[in-house]
Amino acid sequence: MKLTDKQINAIKEEYAQWKDKMYADNSVSRRKDFGQFFTPPELSIKMLEKFENTEGTILDPCCGAGNLLAAAIKAGFDPTKVYGIEIDEDILNIAQSRLVPLGVPCANIHLGDALNPNSYDF
């Protein structure tokens, strides 16, 4: 699947807006403490171009500010089948504020540590 130039530009614009806020609000040491490494929009787009079927469900276990999930929606995934988990509540709030206007239910973006098997009972 190829994204249109309009979709690519929208993803880049969203990324630039939240990146400025995120870096202003979060120190380098805090990002290191949480192991935060954000996926650039260009990489999110390249990853999603590999999907031939947008009928499924997407789960990003370390969704950050939602770059990959926003790109998935713009690529044609159903927003109600997009899920994210984020350990940092401040970054989670950014993800929710970006994804809810795109149609993702707020309840689909969870606060939690998806890398810790003891965090969930499923």
Positions of predicted regions on the chain:
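SAM-dependent methyltransferase catalytic region
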Residues: 1-122
